[in-house]
Amino acid sequence: MVTKEQVEASLTSKLKPIHLEVIDISGGCGSSFEVEVVSEQFEGKRLLERHRMVNAALEEEMKEIHALSIKKAQTPQQWKPPSQDSATLTKDA
């Protein structure tokens, strides 16, 4: 069984992300994951190439993972960190 921590460790060691989010969407059985990866290594690469890089970084884990959803594979310049202000409601009334 692949763990969230294993996926995080492999992506961190191979892609050196400045932002990484891994979510086990299989209910804890380690068969399905969603990932967001922001890495300088994606500079100059098209989206398909970036996805291939993520899959290559998880080569060993992919032998046991049933599904991998790559939600984001962005460069630091493309990535916009979640803003604390976005949760604030404005008063227009």
From Swiss-Prot:
The modification S-glutathionyl cysteine is found at residue 29. Homodimer. Interacts in vitro with GRXS14, GRXS15, GRXS16 and GRXS17, but not with GRXC5. Interacts in vivo only with GRXS17. The keyword Protease does not apply. May act either alone or in interaction with glutaredoxin as a redox-regulated transcriptional regulator, or as a factor regulating Fe-S cluster biogenesis. The GRXS17-BOLA2 heterodimer binds a labile, oxygen sensitive iron-sulfur cluster. One of its GO terms (molecular function) is 2 iron, 2 sulfur cluster binding. Residues 72-93 are annotated as: Disordered. Signal peptide: none annotated. This is Protein BOLA2. It comes from Arabidopsis thaliana. InterPro entries: BOL2, BolA, BolA-like_sf. One of its GO terms (cellular component) is cytoplasm. Can be either glutathionylated or forming covalent homodimers, depending on the oxidation state. One of its GO terms (biological process) is response to iron ion. It is found in: Cytoplasm; Nucleus. Keywords: Cytoplasm, Disulfide bond, Glutathionylation, Nucleus. The keyword Nucleus applies.
